[in-house]
Amino acid sequence: PTVLSFVFANCQTVCPVLVRNVTRAARTLGPGTVNIALVTLDPWRDTPAALPELAARWTLPEGSRLLSGEPENVCRLLDTLQVARERDLKNGDVSHVPLVMIVDARGRIVYRFSNPPAEWIIEGVRRVRSGS
């Protein structure tokens, strides 16, 4: 399974907690058990070139993916996944729900959580892995 979440580097509120919970879940589940993919909500500042520094700062587990790209492409993906957000054009910050999705091997979104503790993520991944 893949744990998919949506964050941005300059977020000082929910993103650090979200990243911490996703990271804790992945480490508890163990290497090779789950894929982590974090999609930026701020592709204007979180450019592909900035992502390695961000991954190091967040101490993401080995194999985690931070994803960005052209703003129009990232926004299209976020819209397709129904990720609600609002960008403040004055300071660039993004108001958003702390969303985590668990995606199965077929690419189906099996769970969609708002601000889940690590334990919910762990249980969701275990259920997806077991097929229940």
Model features per residue range: what roles?
Residues 17-77:
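Structural microenvironment flanking redox-active thiols in thiol-disulfide oxidoreductases
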Residues 6, 87-88:
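N-terminal post-signal-peptidase region of extra-cytosolic proteins
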Residues 88-132:
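Thiol-/selenol-based redox modules, centered on thioredoxin-like
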Residues 1-22:
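Short active-site neighborhood of thiol/selenol oxidoreductases, capturing the structured segment around
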Residues 13, 49, 75-76, 119-123:
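Alpha-helical elements of the RecA-like P-loop NTPase motor core of helicases
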Residues 8-9, 39-44, 60, 70-72, ...:
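Solvent-exposed coil/turn segments that connect beta secondary-structure elements
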Residues 3-4, 36, 100:
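Hydrophobic beta-strand anchors of alpha/beta hydrolase catalytic cores
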Residues 62-64, 75, 81-87, 93-101:
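Structural micro-motif
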